[in-house]
Amino acid sequence: MYQSFKGGLGGIALAKHGRSRAINAENPHGEKGKGGMAASHLGPSRKGSPCLNDIEPGATVTLAEMEGPGEINHIWITVDNKTTDADCFVLRDLVIRMYWDDEETPSVESPLGDFFCCGFGRECIVNSVPMAVVPSRGFNCYFPMPFKKKAKITLENQHANKIPAFFYQVDYCLYDELPDDITYFHAQWRRERLTEKQKDYTILDGVKGKGHYVGTYIALTTLERYWWGEGEMKFYIDGDDEYPTICGTGTEGYFGGSWSFAKQVDGKTVEQNYNTPYLGYPYYSAHDELIHNFYHNDDCPPMRGFYRWHIQDPICFDEDLRVTIQQIGVGYRGLFERQDDVASVAYWYQTHPHAPFAPLMSKEDRWPR
């Protein structure tokens, strides 16, 4: 009997009816009674296979493949963020994909870091309900991911070098059956390196079917002066054309903040970072902290990362969905149209089949500025 465990403390004492399993390098098929069998110099079953080693450039490895019915409850991953000073965007070069049942195109496709709300090839602390990133580069996802027939998670190494060590675990439960009205988890990454003036950036489009939108991650690199966050978030639902059904009041409002997140420090206005269960602004930097070069400093365009989870307030649709955000700023002369560098991950659930995603841009085009 299917019983999702995502009910909080209120239902934790109720009997659970799933069969718990885990896939990692120690038990790559999640088999019952076969975890931790690999030997090390310490002896049998003593940490003999803690990770995947030396993933070759261009290789795609299957992290997990399991038969259903079942539901993934948790994914944990950690990996170094660079292999050399010149090859320092591992989190943008690794691509994670997920497939449900018999589909041939992925329902999830994203650079690894961005999927976990860590854009720009850099990690940051994320403290939210469905995503948590903890020291040091401990990436955790708690979105439930049900599947009726089977599930597959792959990792493609588009990095220039071998990945020396990749640690991971996929925790899931098997069930006798799933409800007929179950929907499937999806996530898609996009980027415009320079947005078009007076044209809203598209976070998600082409979605057909019934489902609900559950989250947004945005990695914004500002390329112009002054305040950047007046753009409104728009949800075009079930046939909306020129105008959306839902339109917000500004970017900082969509992420739960107000008045430019500002405070005064030593006579200067600075933006405040924050993490909450359902929305956050966990990352700001105008420096490349991973480099030290004798010929140039570490300055780079300002980078900001935001998340918003529609868990308590899902955006429901019966037929189709499109999600966009404006690029509008404000300066001394009032509102103005901006052109910035915007990347995003959209998270949603929907019935299958789903439309294939547009091809992922090249790794060089994914790199931060």
How would you describe each model-predicted region?
Residues 1-369:
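Beta-strand-centric surfaces of beta-sandwich/beta-rich domains
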